[in-house]
């Protein structure tokens, strides 16, 4: 699993399941969404946003891993920043104290 921060959507969390080739997300206007992707090559993904109800524009978007896999740079200019630690570890620690 990879965890990403999306600054263009109020800093929402994105989870990329690299084994299932699925991206899970949440936005202020859509509480939960799931999209799929395929690999175009080692560093490029083609993401199918047809299942995301609030997505506007192109339904298939290309994104590329950059900055030693710390950035996902989308063709629309958005850049997701990678979170190296699982955010749920901190949440579980906080909730169980």
Where are these regions (language model features)?
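Secondary-structure transition/turn motif
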Residues: 8-10, 24-33, 48-56, 73-79
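Low-complexity, intrinsically disordered flanking regions
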Residues: 37, 90-97
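Short, compact, well-ordered microdomains
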Residues: 60-84
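Tryptophan-anchored aromatic micro-motifs
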Residues: 1-14, 19-25, 75-82, 92-94
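Short, exposed beta-strand/loop patches in secreted or surface proteins that constitute
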Residues: 12-17, 31-41, 53-67
């Amino acid at each position: 699993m990879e965890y990403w921060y999306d600054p263009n959507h109020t800093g929402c969390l994105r989870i990329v399941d690299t084994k299932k080739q699925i991206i899970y997300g949440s936005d202020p206007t859509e509480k939960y969404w799931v999209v799929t992707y395929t690999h175009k090559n080692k560093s490029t993904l083609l993401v199918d946003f047809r299942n995301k109800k609030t997505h506007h524009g192109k339904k298939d978007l290309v994104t590329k891993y950059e900055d030693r896999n710390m950035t996902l740079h989308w063709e629309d200019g958005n850049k997701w920043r990678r979170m190296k630690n699982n955010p749920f570890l901190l949440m579980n620690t906080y909730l169980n104290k």
